[in-house]
């Protein structure tokens, strides 16, 4: 966890500079000594079984309720929508609009999550993705991945930080109820579970 947090904070340090935030604006919210909902998970997606659809998502399209997600995996299965994705409706891409994220030996896949999108008032974008059965012969193997997710300290107000690069809230945004990171994380997980139950 400590090493993963160090990597995430290096990324957030770069983002602080690019967003013209004072040093520590993001990194101070992600200390290993603070109570938070950071997590380290081992994920297993079973191998392809004949008779089941190869393209049936192992995890439906979603964005992560984290600041930074760091994924270690050695089989395919992760997909992201193309930038010019053809949409069925405002939230649903066509099957042809998804592309594979190829895992590379000795590399991790890094994804920004919803927390950074909130803290930057949509300047940073949370990456939408899904998990499907691995392509080709890889589908014959169980897919194991290690996922590290960092979240702001539990008492962090989930509101945009102040910076010349971050737009001020609109009057409508300013009316929204302010929650801390702990409550926001719990609400986000409940939403994902609700979507999963409907699938």
Q: Where does each model-flagged region fall?
A:
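C-terminal flanking tails of non-heme Fe-dependent oxygenases
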Residues: 5-199
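Basic, alpha-helical interaction scaffolds
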Residues: 1-2
């Amino acid at each position: 966890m400590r090493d993963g947090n160090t990597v995430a904070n290096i990324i957030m340090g770069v983002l602080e500079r690019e967003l013209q935030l004072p040093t520590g604006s993001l990194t101070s919210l992600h200390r290993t000594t603070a109570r938070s909902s950071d997590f380290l998970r081992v994920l297993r997606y079973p191998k392809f079984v004949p008779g089941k659809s190869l393209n049936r998502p192992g995890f439906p399209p979603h964005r992560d309720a984290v600041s930074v997600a760091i994924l270690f995996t050695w089989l395919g299965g992760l997909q992201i929508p193309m930038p010019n994705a053809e949409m069925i409706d405002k939230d649903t891409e066509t099957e042809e609009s998804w592309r594979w994220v190829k895992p590379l030996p000795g590399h991790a896949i890094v994804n920004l999550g919803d927390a950074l999108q909130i803290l930057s008032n949509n300047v940073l974008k949370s990456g939408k993705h899904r998990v499907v059965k691995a392509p080709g012969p890889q589908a014959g193997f169980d897919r194991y991945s290690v996922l590290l997710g960092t979240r702001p300290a539990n008492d962090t107000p989930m509101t945009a930080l102040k910076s010349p690069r971050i737009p001020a809230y609109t009057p409508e945004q300013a009316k929204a109820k302010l929650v801390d990171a702990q409550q926001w994380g719990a609400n986000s997980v409940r939403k994902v579970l609700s979507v999963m139950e409907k699938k």
